[in-house]
Amino acid sequence: MASTFSATTSSCNLSSSAAISSFPLAAGKRNANKVVLPRKNRNVKVSAMAKELHFNKDGSAIKKLQNGVNKLADLVGVTLGPKGRNVVLESKYGSPKIVNDGVTVAKEVELEDPVENIGAKLVRQAAAKTNDLAGDGTTTSVVLAQGLIAEGVKVVAAGANPVLITRGIEKTSKALVAELKKMSKEVEDSELADVAAVSAGNNHEVGNMIAEALSKVGRKGVVTLEEGKSAENSLYVVEGMQFDRGYISPYFVTDSEKMTVEFENCKLLLVDKKITNARDLINILEDAIRSGFPIVIIAEDIEQEALATLVVNKLRGSLKIAALKAPGFGERKSQYLDDIAILTGGTVIREEVGLTLDKADKEVLGNAAKVVLTKDTTTIVGDGSTQEAVNKRVSQIKNQIEAAEQEYEKEKLSERIAKLSGGVAVIQVGAQTETELKEKKLRVEDALNATKAAVEEGIVVGGGCTLLRLASKVDAIKDTLANDEEKVGADIVKRALSYPLKLIAKNAGVNGSVVSEKVLSSDNPKYGYNAATGKYEDLMAAGIIDPTKVVRCCLEHASSVAKTFLMSDCVVVEIKEPESAPVGNPMDNSGYGNI
């Protein structure tokens, strides 16, 4: 059942965007080498949009939502397992994408029916969240969410209370996460290659390369990916540093698909104070415009007026720039800035040593071969010219560790040494064509993320068998639940846990139900189905391994999405305005022949 009402929504132009639109083109040409300070614009646009309400009185709303879930899950599901297929995605510009990565496929899906589209978006959250936290397991999250929703809708349609059902799902999922941690084991160095290979679609070349990269920079070292110039993959290590600070504003992003800032051969301005006045930066910024080099500003903070100036000039295309807050706090922040200065050969602007921002010139800037910023992290790769200074700095910090008394202080100092001397391993992904390169890079990225997740929380048996084994723990968990309807929620989880293994088997051309029964017939927790070879064997010995963190995130996020879905009873969507007919040309004389 659907009904309509009007709702008013307002949208304000961002000050930076408004300021940009107020610059005449001629002025832009006259001031090509000048930094433009933004002008304020307080115009507000208000628009009204009618909404359509879909109530669930006859079950139609939930059915449509579930259709959207199934369409997305069926599409993403074809990529699951070692014998999963690829999905071809149309690209408006350039060649089509051929991908085997669940979250990339999920992001591209927009369904025509608005209610079905909401269902698809809802389950897409499970993939996106798993990707953000674990970097892999996105397809499994979607398939598991589909299973929980399918089983849940059946019992809710039969009259069960959705509130108690979802409470049972939540309690069971939490208990299963605790059981999962008991099944987990710490990953050995020899197993890292297997973890990466499984995630890369059974590609052992990629697995071995990632294991080699981690052996060179350490388990907690930084590994980045680049597009190679040849058809072969390659690995090299350069000195570099990574810390937990991302760009201040998303307007600095240079790659809108990955939401990252990437600069090569760029300069760094290091400021140990808050930047309050944009005019203090003009000398440095006009140097950057004239010389054409990208610049990254690392400061204690940047106030809104100064930030608006940077954003406006970046969006106008006159300046390649990004800004971020310095890592750490207080004295530790100053030490981090000094570390960055030594790595890049720059000078930290500090008033107490007689350096002021308004008098600074390009002599104080550091140099970096590459800088990559995400919303949460920054990676700085040096140009190799400061290795001697870096070694001296590391020796100084080691002396401080020996003198430090508190464990926390020693830990933080050791962290600084790792950032300075650990270096960055760079994997260059090679391929014959651009289409193959994009697909291959996504696989390697998944493999790298899976390996990092395995280092963090350990590993479990792969191939969907760990989730299937968890189902056998549900009966014991049911005894702790308060009432029968919560126990029904636990049964929903139990049935849904077999969905990923069944789909892996189906994609390998085998009956999923037969496979799951055969796996459960053995009491050996490592026994399972190897879809790559078609054999039943000890999966841990065969190298079929999943990171515990990935399996945990799949379970948590799929159950979270399923709870939200099953509690829904009404859907609100915008009514699409009909496209207006094109206005005819009043001077059209076509009816009178050619003139």
Swiss-Prot record:
Note: This protein shows ATPase activity.
GO cellular component: chloroplast
InterPro entries: Chaperonin_Cpn60_CS, Cpn60/GroEL, Cpn60/GroEL/TCP-1, GroEL-like_apical_dom_sf, GROEL-like_equatorial_sf, TCP-1-like_intermed_sf
PANTHER family assigned: 60 KDA HEAT SHOCK PROTEIN, MITOCHONDRIAL
GO biological process: protein refolding
Sorted UniProt keywords: ATP-binding, Chaperone, Chloroplast, Nucleotide-binding, Plastid, Transit peptide
Main location: plastid
Pfam families, per the entry: Cpn60_TCP1
Species assigned in the record: Pisum sativum
Transit sequence range: 1-49
Single GO MF annotation: ATP-dependent protein folding chaperone
Protein name: RuBisCO large subunit-binding protein subunit beta, chloroplastic
N-terminal signal peptide: none
Subunit annotation: Oligomer of probably six alpha and six beta subunits.
Protein localization: Plastid, Chloroplast
CDD domains on file: GroEL (cd03344)
Family affiliation: Belongs to the chaperonin (HSP60) family.
Cited function: This protein binds RuBisCO small and large subunits and is implicated in the assembly of the enzyme oligomer.
